Structures are given as structure tokens and as C-alpha cells.
Curated annotation (Swiss-Prot):
It is found in: Cytoplasm. UMP binds at residues 51, 71, 132-139. This is Uridylate kinase. Its EC number is 2.7.4.22. It catalyses: UMP + ATP = UDP + ADP. One of its GO terms (molecular function) is UMP kinase activity. NCBIfam families: pyrH_bact. Gene3D superfamilies: Acetylglutamate kinase-like (3.40.1160.10). Homohexamer. Belongs to the UMP kinase family. The lineage of its organism: Bacteria, Bacillati, Cyanobacteriota, Cyanophyceae, Synechococcales. The gene is pyrH. Allosterically activated by GTP. Inhibited by UTP. Pathway: Pyrimidine metabolism; CTP biosynthesis via de novo pathway; UDP from UMP (UMPK route): step 1/1. GO terms for biological process: 'de novo' CTP biosynthetic process; UDP biosynthetic process.
């Protein structure tokens, strides 16, 4: 199966590479190169990016900030990442638009669903920033929401690991990777893939999720082509 319209979820942490903070330009360039090849092949691609490389709302809340305030700061961090991604993509020859859920007309378009879909149809990449514009919702949930809104075929969750494991592979040498999971497997097993709201949204709208390693060059293209990489979450076969 080749996917024609994809929602790619990138974590903020992925953008910082091996650094402890911020954005690694080499990672941005690598992502842009992979995305350019996918778009050149005719796939329509939208991106939701997190902000954890700059600020995490939950961490701010744990440190004493009001949760809603901390989440708004996190949303602004995602816009910094979105604009950086736009720059990298356009340098790679990919026409890109940033749309934000909080109006910032000097640097981005406001999120307008129909306009986003027209951009995709014209071969442009759309990067969604500022989460969904509301506190208490993660960028994973935003990815599921935007995927449903733009009628995406699939959500790609590109991470630092090559799939979903039964336990943390960084801590357990005997961790087993799941090739296929149902939405209910993830929800009932409380597997650390996406938060339960994001999984439930994908389940309700029958949007499959593919989890794979972002740092393996060409993996975005392999996932688009439907190659069996990473872990796939969906309805029972």
C-alpha cells in the first residue's frame, strides 16, 4: 500500500539530535531531504511538530507553573520549530507553509482547514504549529486531530526508536518489538506510543499509525511506500 496523504508527527526532542537542547541543523536538513524525495514522488505531506526540545508544558507545570500557562509556552516553542522546519524544507526545494492554531500573521498563516488542504493538493508541505491552540492537549493529539481534519490516510510517528516495544528497549535488553498492534492493545496495555486521547481519535476515525525510527535515512519514504518498517497500529486484521 502506498499512502497518498500523510500526517507526519515529529517530536521536538527529535530535532535536537544528540544535543541536550535546541535544534540540530543537520537533523533538520536530513528530514528535509527525506521529505523532498517523498513530495517529489507525489505524496501529499503535512507535519505536526512538538516543542519539547525548547519547552515542555508538563515539566513547567511540575515546576510550579500553572498548567495552562505552561502549555501555552510549549505551543510557542512548537512555532519556533515549525518555522525552522519550513526554512530547511524550502532550502531543499519544497514549497512549505506554516499554519498556527494561535494567530501570528507576521510569521505564519492561521490554521484554516480548507486552505491547508488546498496547499496539499498543490504539492506544498504544510507544517502545523502551536498545537491545537488549547492547553491540556498534546501535540500527539493535535496530530490525530489534524489527520482527521485533512483526511490523511495515515499518521506517521517518527521517533528515536524503531517501533513499539513491550517495555523500554533502552533499559531492557529483552524488550520485544511489536510489528502490529490494535488501538485497543495500545490503550489497554498503556504502551508509551501516544497519549490515550490521540489513540482514541485515530481509532474513532480509522486512521492507522506507523511508528518508526526517524534517524534511519529513507525511512519516511519506506513508510510512505507501505514497506514493513517499525510498528503499525490499526484495527484487527
Amino acid at each position: 500500500m502506498t499512502y497518498s496523504r500523510v500526517l507526519l508527527k515529529l517530536s521536538g526532542e527529535a530535532l535536537m539530535g544528540t544535543q541536550g537542547y535546541g535544534i540540530d541543523p543537520a537533523i533538520v536538513n536530513s528530514i528535509a531531504s527525506d521529505v523532498a524525495k517523498v513530495v517529489a514522488g507525489g505524496t501529499e505531506l503535512a507535519i505536526v511538530v512538538g516543542g519539547g526540545n525548547i519547552f515542555r508544558g508538563l515539566k513547567g507545570s511540575a515546576a510550579g507553573m500553572e498548567r495552562a500557562t505552561a502549555d501555552y509556552v510549549g505551543m510557542l516553542a512548537t512555532v519556533m520549530n515549525a518555522i525552522t522546519l519550513q526554512d530547511g524544507l524550502e532550502r531543499a526545494g519544497v514549497p512549505t507553509r506554516v499554519q498556527t492554531a494561535i494567530a501570528m500573521q507576521e510569521v505564519a498563516e492561521p490554521y484554516i482547514r480548507r486552505k491547508a488542504m488546498r496547499h496539499l493538493e498543490k504539492g506544498r508541505v504544510v507544517v502545523f504549529g502551536a498545537g491545537c491552540g488549547n492547553p491540556f492537549f498534546t501535540t500527539d493529539t493535535t496530530a490525530a486531530l489534524r489527520a482527521a481534519e485533512i483526511n490523511a490516510d495515515v499518521v506517521f510517528k517518527a521517533t528515536k526508536v524503531d517501533g513499539v516495544y513491550d517495555k523500554d528497549p533502552a533499559k531492557h535488553a529483552d524488550a520485544v518489538k511489536h510489528a502490529h498492534l490494535t488501538y485497543q492493545d495500545v490503550l489497554s496495555g498503556e504502551l508509551a506510543v501516544m497519549d490515550s486521547t490521540a489513540i482514541a481519535l485515530c481509532k474513532d476515525n480509522n486512521i492507522p499509525i506507523v511508528v518508526f525510527n526517524l534517524f534511519e535515512p529513507g525511512n519516511i519514504g519506506r513508510a510512505v511506500a507501505g514497506e514493513p518498517i517499525g510498528s503499525r497500529i490499526g484495527n484487527p486484521a
